[in-house]
């Protein structure tokens, strides 16, 4: 089994079903070298941000901070939540995203 120095994921985690998120994250963490980095972002739902018209039917809901909690035992270099404008599909709308950079220190 290979160990990794960096795991980068953008636009992927919102396709992971809630019942297997903890298991997948634990597996990725287990196979990351000491001082390895995970840089991950995930779309999160907010009651005041309308569901985008281009929402993929296979997207699974995440809540604010859920990603960060999966890495509570790692050093968190960055945790940020942003709301940004988007015009995909030709329809102006917004997305909310949690962004994390975490380091395995043990």
Regions found by a protein language model. Give the residues of each.
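Class I (Rossmann-like) S-adenosyl-L-methionine-dependent methyltransferase catalytic domain
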Residues: 1, 16-23, 27, 37-106
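A short acidic, Gly/Pro-enriched loop at the edge of an enzyme's catalytic core
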Residues: 1-7
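A short beta-strand submotif of the Rossmann-like class I SAM-dependent methyltransferase core
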Residues: 9-12
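Acidic, metal-coordinating catalytic segment for phosphate/diphosphate chemistry
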Residues: 32
């Amino acid at each position: 089994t290979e160990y990794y120095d960096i795991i980068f994921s953008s636009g992927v985690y919102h396709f992971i079903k809630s019942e297997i998120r903890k298991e997948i994250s634990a597996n990725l963490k287990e196979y990351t070298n000491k001082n390895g980095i995970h840089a991950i972002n995930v779309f999160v739902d907010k009651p005041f941000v309308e569901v985008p018209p281009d929402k993929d039917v296979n997207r699974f809901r995440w809540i604010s901070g859920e990603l960060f909690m999966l890495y509570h035992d790692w050093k968190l270099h960055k945790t940020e939540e942003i709301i940004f404008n988007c015009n995909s599909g030709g329809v102006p709308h917004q997305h909310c995203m949690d962004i994390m950079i975490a380091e395995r220190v043990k």
